[in-house]
UniProtKB/Swiss-Prot annotation:
One of its GO terms (cellular component) is cytoplasm. One of its GO terms (molecular function) is rRNA binding. Belongs to the universal ribosomal protein uS14 family. Keywords: Ribonucleoprotein, Ribosomal protein, RNA-binding, rRNA-binding. This is Small ribosomal subunit protein uS14. GO terms for biological process: translation. Binds 16S rRNA, required for the assembly of 30S particles and may also be responsible for determining the conformation of the 16S rRNA at the A site. InterPro entries: Ribosomal_uS14, Ribosomal_uS14_bac/plastid, Ribosomal_uS14_CS. It comes from Mesorhizobium japonicum (strain LMG 29417 / CECT 9101 / MAFF 303099) (Mesorhizobium loti (strain MAFF 303099)). Part of the 30S ribosomal subunit. Contacts proteins S3 and S10. It comes from the Bacteria. Gene3D superfamilies: 1.10.287.1480. Residues 1-21 are annotated as: Disordered.
């Protein structure tokens, strides 16, 4: 089980990313628009820099929904390899069969 503080920190980052997502996208569109004057683009860049760092989507870490483990994460199932194995052995994931040869 991951530290609760790490999981909560990641949840705060998700909430901030959802909250500031549209504003960040609008500012980035202004910054990337070559037809806008340089001063306006620079002001948009300063506004973007003033936003919280944790509101950037890139700072969100994929974590297992069951254990909070940050590594060996299956995106499709949103669980780590260890949780996947445990859930599969318990028969809680339909269609997953333990391999044996």
């Amino acid at each position: 089980m991951a530290k609760t503080s790490s999981v909560e920190k990641n949840n705060r980052r998700r909430k901030l990313a959802d909250q500031y997502g549209p504003k960040r996208a609008a500012l980035k569109a202004i910054i990337m628009d070559q037809s806008k004057p340089m001063e306006e683009r620079f002001r948009a860049q300063l506004k973007l820099a003033a936003l919280p760092r944790n509101s950037a989507k890139i700072r969100i870490r994929n974590r297992c929904e069951v254990t909070g483990r940050p590594r060996a994460y299956y995106r499709k199932l949103k669980v780590s390899r260890i949780a996947l194995r445990d859930l599969g052995n318990n028969g809680q994931i339909p269609g997953l069969v333990k391999s044996s040869w």
